[in-house]
From Swiss-Prot:
Homodimer. It comes from the Eukaryota. This is Glycine--tRNA ligase. The modification N6-acetyllysine is found at K204, K501. Human GlyRS uses direct ATP condensation to synthesize Ap4A, a unique amino acid-independent mechanism, in contrast to the classical amino acid-dependent mechanism for synthesis of Ap4A by a tRNA synthetase, that involves the generation of an enzyme-bound aminoacyl-AMP which is then attacked by ATP to form Ap4A. Catalyzes the ATP-dependent ligation of glycine to the 3'-end of its cognate tRNA, via the formation of an aminoacyl-adenylate intermediate (Gly-AMP). Also produces diadenosine tetraphosphate (Ap4A), a universal pleiotropic signaling molecule needed for cell regulation pathways, by direct condensation of 2 ATPs. Thereby, may play a special role in Ap4A homeostasis. Keywords: Acetylation, Aminoacyl-tRNA synthetase, ATP-binding, Cell projection, Charcot-Marie-Tooth disease, Cytoplasm, Disease variant, Hydrolase, Ligase, Mitochondrion, Neurodegeneration, Neuropathy, Nucleotide-binding, Phosphoprotein, Protein biosynthesis, Secreted, Transferase, Transit peptide. The gene is GARS1. Its EC number is 6.1.1.14, 2.7.7.-. The keyword Repeat does not apply. CDD domains: GlyRS-like_core (cd00774), GlyRS_anticodon (cd00858), GlyRS_RNA (cd00935). It comes from Homo sapiens.
Length: 739
């Protein structure tokens, strides 16, 4: 994860904009103030109709039209600057302005959504905490931010989401699953780019040690200064220029800015330390000597890349194939927040699909080609357009999605997310713009879900090209390639160094191996160039691993010959779907949380049966001992059928117990009543959580019915069509033995 990087503070910004009066929302320039000379467009204004209340489609579009126009104009300017090869500083300013206008547009879109489309987060989080879905870890010691423990219900839900993922991807696609260590030696992550690029600048309160992310703090401080009425136009312009380039500043430049603008701790007002680079990985040392630095892995992908040769061999040397891994990853976030959305330890599920770069076609693409889903292309984003619902096949044909392999996985991701409970209407696939792309990706689409925090990334689907395999092959001198049979043999001219092991060994002793490894990987152009130097001067120099070696004619020759090839080596490209399971869980919580009509106190989660923590409850109508043999019989039968269930034989009305099981998302409820005891064959009622409708069936049939419902083999409508609806008991307590 994907490795997935979060969409920062969108929800907070949206909430902030919701609190602002319409007159301020109507002038985003007052919020952003980015007059960037050649890198900005004229200020925009909104109709007076802008308000916090929801409005119909036509009214909303009237409000959004000027914002869309502003984004489109800025996008055109960015393209023109790039075409004209303008100075990079001007391009960066224009891109920063484009991002700012996009944020205003998106915030306004969220503000105009219907009120009934917004979940009551406070009520939902109260339910989650009260029923121990999850809670802050180490709570009795005061807790640690960004770390969470899952309770019985949350753990069951998480396991079911993972098991559904395994069935949907690993079993369906015959993916090779592996389980790699979480401890990773430093050279691996140095090669992958994480050691150098997986970092943010951080400042500390010099008195209490509280940490802040430097760029976020500087931005908030400058925006506060700019909002002061006493701030001059010249000073505002200067600060706007700083904000526009905020992502491009180095450590010393940030330090100078903190001094120039007298930035203090926003909590205490204390002085701050100079910015320091803070790597987001948890560093440790492997072994007692402390000589082998390592990290807790920031993603699960690297373990798959390092085992590529073994996996290729397991697959009989054939491409394409895919490998997957599910496990915990770690990121030492400076200021984690927003519950499960931004945490320090999280579960990922990642797939690495290895494919011949010249054959990026998926044989099963037609299985998903007719899916219609919301796509938000990079082109649409810079044009100020919204996500557009498209047929997946059309998106590939029109070049919106680059190839059918990427398209196939986008379709499969969509089917999985909707299967586990995410609303299709609150799900979109957004393409990364060029300046957003991770260091390893050449194309990337994020599955984003709409939540009370705004749009958040829950799955990344990246085309990593051959970045990782190439990097690890260079670092280890181990070729991470696949062999592709040629249709016809071909003869090629080969030019290679022919070193004298004895002469080189005598001259360079222990370093001889370095020299030999270097000479073995040189290409034809380099060899020809060195041959000329060898003929002219009798020697040439090479440099490897920071050391320089001089080679003479008695140490090396150049050999030329012809070779017939029957196979060619290819470095596979990688398509990587990366799932953040915690974020998926949180989205499922929001998209399935409901309040019963007419009763604000009765809340429930409408989890799909396939992922519900318990598939059904077993509820005796009362504590009458006549019911207990049937409860035991039914519970044992459900266990034999592999159906997770919860017996609730506590005191309290049956309605109250229904409400308790609904609150934790139990999909169905079996009730043992007096008709169960008094009539033969013995029957019981089966209740559907969402509709609250009930049918009556024989006890012997109920385990199979619930099993089929939980596995998705039948629907509740199928059950109602087959069995009579339950209207009420026909017998009562008086016909049974008194309690």
């Amino acid at each position: 994860m994907p490795s997935p990087r979060p969409v920062l503070l969108r929800g907070a910004r949206a909430a902030l904009l919701l609190l602002l009066p319409p007159r301020l929302l109507a002038r985003p320039s007052l919020l952003l103030r980015r007059s960037l000379s050649a890198a900005s467009c004229p200020p925009i204004s909104l109709p007076a109709a802008a308000s916090r209340s929801s409005m119909d489609g036509a009214g909303a579009e009237e409000v959004l039209a000027p914002l869309r126009l502003a984004v489109r104009q800025q996008g055109d300017l960015v393209r023109k600057l790039k075409e004209d090869k303008a100075p990079q500083v001007d391009v960066d300013k224009a891109v920063a302005e484009l991002k700012a206008r996009k944020r205003v547009l998106e915030a306004k879109e969220l503000a105009l959504q219907p009120k009934d489309d917004i979940v009551d987060r406070a009520k939902m989080e109260d339910t989650l905490k009260r029923r121990f879905f999850y809670d802050q870890a180490f709570a009795i010691y005061g807790g640690v931010s960004g770390l969470y423990d899952f309770g019985p219900v949350g753990c069951a839900l998480k396991n079911n989401i993972i098991q559904t993922w395994r069935q949907h991807f690993i079993q369906e696609e015959q993916i090779l699953e592996i389980d790699c260590t979480m401890l990773t030696p430093e050279p691996v992550l140095k090669t992958s780019g994480h050691v150098d690029k997986f970092a943010d600048f951080m400042v500390k309160d010099v008195k209490n040690g509280e940490c802040f992310r430097a760029d976020h703090l500087l931005k908030a401080h400058l925006q506060k200064l700019m909002s002061d009425k006493k701030c001059s136009v010249e000073k505002k312009s200067e600060m706007e220029s700083v904000l526009a380039q905020l992502d491009n500043y180095g450590q010393q430049e940030l330090a100078d800015l903190f001094v120039n603008y007298n930035v203090k701790s926003p909590i205490t007002g204390n002085d701050l330390s100079p910015p320091v680079s803070f790597n987001l990985m948890f560093k440790t040392f492997i072994g007692p000597g402390g000589n082998m630095p390592g990290y807790l892995r920031p993603e699960t992908a690297q373990g798959i890349f390092l085992n590529f040769k073994r996996l290729l061999e397991f697959n009989q040397g054939k491409l394409p194939f895919a490998a997957a891994q599910i496990g915990n990853s770690f990121r030492n976030e400076i200021s984690p927040r927003s519950g499960l959305i931004r945490v320090r330890e999280f579960t990922m599920a990642e797939i690495e699909h290895f494919v011949d770069p010249s054959e990026k076609d998926h044989p099963k693409f037609q299985n998903v080609a007719d899916l219609h889903l919301y796509l938000y292309s990079a082109k649409a984003q810079v044009s100020g357009q919204s996500a557009r619902k498209m047929r997946l096949g059309d998106a590939v044909e029109q070049g919106v999605i680059n190839n059918t392999v990427l398209g196939y996985f986008i379709g499969r991701i969509y089917l999985y997310l909707t299967k586990v409970g995410i609303s299709p209407d609150k799900l979109r696939f957004r393409q990364h713009m060029e300046n957003e792309m991770a260091h390893y990706a050449c194309d990337c689409w994020d599955a984003e879900s709409k939540t009370s925090y705004g749009w958040i990334e829950i799955v990344g689907c990246a085309d990593r090209s051959c970045y990782d395999l190439s990097c690890h092959a260079r670092a280890t001198k181990v070729p991470l390639v696949a062999e592709k049979p040629l249709k016809e043999p071909k003869t090629v001219n080969v030019v290679q160094f022919e070193p004298s092991k004895g002469a080189i060994g005598k001259a360079y002793k222990k370093d001889a191996k370095l020299v030999m490894e270097y000479l073995a990987i040189c290409d034809e152009c380099y060899i020809t160039e060195m041959e000329m130097l060898l003929n002219e001067k009798g020697e040439f120099t090479i440099e490897t691993e920071g050391k320089t070696f001089q080679l003479t004619k008695d140490m090396i020759n150049v050999k030329r010959f012809q070779k017939t090839l029957y196979v060619e080596e290819v470095v596979p490209n990688v398509i990587e779907p990366s799932f953040g399971l915690g974020r998926i869980m949180y989205t499922v919580f929001e998209h399935t949380f409901h309040v019963r009509e007419g009763d604000e106190q009765r809340t429930f989660f409408s989890f799909p049966a396939v992922v519900a923590p318990f598939k059904c409850s077993v509820l005796p109508l009362s504590q009458n001992q006549e019911f207990m043999p049937f409860v035991k019989e039914l519970s044992e039968a459900l266990t034999r059928h592999g159906v997770s269930h919860k017996v609730d034989d506590s005191s309290g009305s049956i309605g109250r117990r229904y409400a308790r099981t609904d609150e934790i998302g139990v999909a169905f409820g079996v009730t043992i009543d007096f008709d169960t005891v008094n009539k033969t064959p013995h029957t019981a009622t089966l209740r559907d959580r969402d509709s609250m409708r009930q049918i009556r069936a024989e006890i012997s049939e109920l385990p199979s019915i619930v099993q089929d419902l939980a596995n998705g083999n039948i629907t509740w409508a199928d059950v109602e069509a087959r069995y009579p609806l339950f209207e009420g008991q026909e017998t009562g307590k008086k016909e049974t033995i008194e309690e």
